Amino acid sequence: MKFMGANELREKYLSFFESKDHLRLQSFPLVPKNDKSLLLINAGMAPLKPYFTGLEEPPKRRITTCQKCIRTGDIENVGKTSRHGTFFEMLGNFSFGDYFKSEIIPWAWEFITETLGIPKDKLYVTIYLNDDEAYDIWTSKTDVDPSRIFRLGKDDNFWEIGVGPCGPCTEIHFDRGEGKVETVEEFLEASDADRIVEFWNLVFTQFDKDEEGNYNELAQKNIDTGMGLERIATIMQGVDNIFEIDTVKNILNKACELTNAKYGEDKDKDVSLRIITDHGKSVTFLICDGVQPSNEGRGYVLRRLLRRAARHGRLLGVKGIFLNEMVDAVVENYGEAYPELKEKADYIKKIIKLEEERFNETIDSGMDILMSYISEMEEKNEKVLSGAKAFKLYDTYGFPLELTQEILEEKGLELDIENFNKEMKEQRERARNARGESSYMGSEESPVNKVDASIVTEFDGYVNLELNSKVIVLGNNEEFKAELKEGEEGFLLTDKTPFYAEMGGQVGDRGNITSETGMAIVTDCKKNVGGKFVHYIKVIEGSLKEGQEVKLSVDASRRSNICKNHTATHMLHEALKEILGDHVNQSGSYVDEERLRFDFTHFAALTEEELEKVELLVNEKIMTVSVVDTKEMSLDEARNSGATCLFDEKYAEKVRVVSVGDFSKELCGGTHVANSGEIGLFKIVSESGVAAGIRRIEAVTGISALKFMELKNNMLKEAASMLKCNEKDIAKRIAAQAHELKEKDKEIAELKAKLVQGAEDDILKDKVEINGVELVTAELKDVDGNSLRDLADKVRNKLNNGIVVLASDNGGKVNLVAMATKNSLANGVHCGKVIKEVAAVVGGGGGGRPDMAQAGGKNPENIAKALEKAKEVVELLVK
């Protein structure tokens, strides 16, 4: 066989099916759109589900893709074996009610034997036990040797998940060994031994399984195929595993270069190198597709992969930041197929660098605590770390659970995962209660998401805010209805509408619907899972009925304010690019009638000067009264025109481009003002960080901007009145008062110091001796932490061989400090252990070194008991 690189294989596959009249689609982003069942795209057909289910019309009945995928179900095995990986590409060709078995089977054989040139005596085919149709096609429409076709049962060659669409499949296998297998038993044995490997699965979706277990023929039969690019690359390159194929090996070589390690010389180092290679590739693609490191959902998947790779870099001796440099190797090997990698390379590197820096801080502090836990376990001969301690590491110090487990495993220890999960569940419940979460009408089981796929609503609301239409569907959260009466809430679909449905960060319209029989207010307009325009309504008079003519009226004033904020968002995006640089890209947005919120990629808080420049530029462009123009064009035309596209969006072939004069040009389906002058005024309200490398600006426009400035002005007037000065002198007056307060604080500190001066002699009068070690304890009043430490240090200096423990009730809070002479440590004295027990008595916590420790508490009434506890602990330590 001729050697073929992974990039060549990808192109050959897609070109082959283009020659069979398939539409080639670019890979969908790794972040699923409108699919709550998936965290990340994990299969080639996953983003095409709406086409298979009939919820959406495919752009063509024949489609081919190379879909990037992430699977983390067996992440613990990645690196430990050379077979597992988190990132992979799935080649696929799909038919939505077009061709079926008689076409795909000979095409598949043609591709692998003629295009790829795989020898026929190296191939085997499996079919479902009873699929005679597939057998007949294989034997009549291809020249496969019938003795190389094996029939297998449901577990191997039938695809189904519960009830719903399902069907048999045929799989194509490659034989890495010599000689022919003659029987099914020999075939299965060779497969289990990895001599024979499956590399292409053709699924024939021809049945609909009902609740009773009956298989009914589907009127529209579909084809869904999947071939792992990495798997076929191992075959075409004659290698045993994914880390040896050309593209992945190049990235592995980069990992070796950055860590100064050689692959193939040490098993443990090989594990670390494979983890860095695989995870480095995955995090590059995840960040490119808009995922940000976080502690939830897909953001946590990213953080986990990145931190696991960073730790294995440390195991290989890397001291500083290095993972961001892996990006270049990924871009070099995948950039032609995925040009967005090239465009976002600098941004990806910066996000990785920020996260790795943060992790290095986390791991340094967390590792010390974990190692102290492990030391305690070893002292007590314990083998299981408590779930509460692991949760504290995770929740308080940001130390990853998986890292805790991995380190414990390396030391032959275990984690009480059950109690960790219990702690996590309780925390989430507290957070949920704090947020006051509630479900929104329209779960996936609701009738609103079961509307007939053939129903189409024409949106005619860019210009028209009022039109007549016909009710085609009525319902509530429980069922479809023929009529909704006064006081009832539900949903309504019409054949056309002026109501904008929430999308692209813009909220849905509100307004009212009237008919001959009644009136309803529209509280919201959204799209259901099938993309249908759904009006959420409350009937306030009479009733609305299915099939009747209605008049739909959008709240014009509210829409106008939304338009101002949406157009201003586009202008803000462009202004940020001009002031900060081209690395700025939209990461999220929200637009309603009161304000706008814009999240964007940037690596530091904006300075006051930068914010002023951005705000001024937007207002200057508003005052040009530029025409806001909208045009429909092909996606390629839009890109060539310089229109801004969002990386995590999947666009149709025809797109809508919104231009604000010659200043801003973006792909957008939202509603906008007719000219920039309608916005009136733009005012930034706040700028903040929302995640690593993501900033957020909130702003207001028009009347809301004027009201905001009026509020600010009133606040200035009130402040000037309270400070008894002119508005222009407020800053000077505050600075002067701050200086006065600082001087007063200094005086207070000096007075407190005088109060405790010489107190050490009084404190030493209560000294006791325990087994040759001196113990001094004392309770003080209104002494702050700094003064308490100074006093303890002075007392310690007057001891020959001993420990001092001081406690102070400082405004209802307890300050504790313990200090010991160095020679007392040899007698068993340990301040950290003493202070830990003492702090518990006053409802606090703390710790420290053997020679010095401090803590706080909240129950000053227990100070006397706490100091008694100090004596008990010292007696135990110096026996």
UniProtKB/Swiss-Prot annotation:
Its EC number is 6.1.1.7. CDD domains: AlaRS_core (cd00673). The keyword Metal-binding applies. Its main location: cytoplasm. Binds 1 zinc ion per subunit. Keywords: Aminoacyl-tRNA synthetase, ATP-binding, Cytoplasm, Ligase, Metal-binding, Nucleotide-binding, Protein biosynthesis, RNA-binding, tRNA-binding, Zinc. It is found in: Cytoplasm. It catalyses: tRNA(Ala) + L-alanine + ATP = L-alanyl-tRNA(Ala) + AMP + diphosphate. Catalyzes the attachment of alanine to tRNA(Ala) in a two-step reaction: alanine is first activated by ATP to form Ala-AMP and then transferred to the acceptor end of tRNA(Ala). Also edits incorrectly charged Ser-tRNA(Ala) and Gly-tRNA(Ala) via its editing domain. This is Alanine--tRNA ligase. It comes from Clostridium perfringens (strain SM101 / Type A).
